[in-house]
Amino acid sequence: MDEEYIIRIANGLFDEAYMAKRYLLTMEQMRSCTAKYRDEMSHSFAFYNDAYSAMVYATTMALARYYDDDSDSIGWKKLYNDFANYVNRMPSNDTYRIEIKLCDVYLFSENKEFYDRLQDEKEKCVWNNFQTCGIMMEMKPKECLYYYKKKKKPLNKHLSNLSKQRNKAFAHNDGVLCFDYEGIDSAFPLDLDAMTALTDYALEFSRFVIAYITGTVKMIPGKNDNDLENTLLLVKNAMESSEIPQQKVRAH
């Protein structure tokens, strides 16, 4: 596989994950503001409800496309395999610094050499930072591939539910659960934490592939914490200011 083709796939999949992350951050804002600005949001309840539902749908579909592993699909599986072949054909002695969370160290226990290195770094990290950070590991390209393959393993349950939801509700209507969206969501749950984990991994892996081949590190979405709250604060101020004259009139 040539570099341009792999980069094209990686960029396309990165864009899918990027939009999914944007949707998730917006949903996070909406959930956060619901308790604080319930009265203000109630004036546009239908809008917020429809917008939230649409973003759940869009996020599910974006992730389903990213992780689609059908033989003819261009998704994570194809990108991983094509990139692995590229690394094997173009060996490099370069190393890459990747952060591994302390809670994920156990995933690599079957590889003794790699695991022992992790344990050594873990002891330094715990001693120096009291477990407040991850382990920064210097890895060769093939070790990076091993890392990303193992890191994906805990996501398999979420991926199974994502696939079931896509096949039974979003791509077409399953004959058994036809239009029973609540039943599908209950049988194959995929909450915001699960979608966030899938999205963060998707961004990280695609970003690594692009950086490895091109040397360019793509930016990932940051939290726009105040976007929605700023608007709702204006609504709140307008509501409060419009109530003042009415209260004075009633007082007289």
Residue spans for each PLM region:
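Amphipathic alpha-helical interface segments
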Residues: 1-158, 184-252
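Histidine-centered, metal-coordinating catalytic motifs and their short helical/loop contexts
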Residues: 152-179
